[in-house]
């Protein structure tokens, strides 16, 4: 029997780290552009500033460690950390907030463990959690009013606000997030009165629904390109939706399903943050448990905790559990019996 002979290469190797990071950064562009349209130039400025800070901080540590800069910086992992943290920050947060959070993320959440591939926690979320706990005022009073409700500041105005704390008009940039607004307003009102507020449109968070749909589109691109798998995003969103349906059926007490899915950092967290290949679970079953845990914790912290958008803390808590999940969910190796976990084999 004759076999066809084809040209090499015959085996397809794994994607390079640089290409993976570049695809993830590219997939954030729809969400970044949507946020810029609805909330102004602040987010774009934050992303650029955070990316530059991340590269500078990584170069600083690599120099101290006497490692080649070009080899390590070209993987774009530092840039991705800056992009994700910049997207998570309030659009008009002071420049030093972005600088401190990004530098801490790179130095103390990534490089101190040995660099890419060794960090047990998501660096961007470590930086975000540090900022939220240390500087709560700066992290909660610089959210922007969406475009339909206020005139969006121009680039120079946004730049002046971020770097020189210039006054650009209180109504132009100061407001609480929709999740925070709903959680506090529902205490003294009903769902109908809360949804009548200007920040809510068609019973969703005005502007934020399009932001989340844009990040969803970027996440689907990553799945299509096989940069990530479906396990973590689907299990996280399914768990969040299930908790909302089972525990949040009374809209006069708890935020409804559509707010949990289409407000805040839900889609950004599901497709770009929770799927971090280093700090997340790696086995297929482990990813399902991991994503479900992130979704459940997100709902619990949003509903009964002090931080309405709880994705960062949910991801960090599940980072603790990732090694445990991987240990107990590894598939059986072909040709071997599955050993009992925790029992020494003779």
UniProtKB/Swiss-Prot annotation:
Post-translational modification FMN phosphoryl threonine, affected residues: 177
Membrane topology term: Multi-pass membrane protein
GO biological process: electron transport chain; transmembrane transport
Transmembrane spans: 25-45, 71-90, 120-140, 204-224, 227-247, 254-274, 288-305
Keyword Disulfide bond: no
EC number: 7.-.-.-
Chief location category: membrane
Subcellular location: Cell inner membrane
Disulfide bond residue pairs: none
HAMAP family, sorted: RsxD_RnfD
Assembly, per entry: The complex is composed of six subunits: RnfA, RnfB, RnfC, RnfD, RnfE and RnfG.
Function: Part of a membrane-bound complex that couples electron transfer with translocation of ions across the membrane.
PANTHER family: ELECTRON TRANSPORT COMPLEX PROTEIN RNFD, ION-TRANSLOCATING OXIDOREDUCTASE COMPLEX SUBUNIT D
Protein name: Ion-translocating oxidoreductase complex subunit D
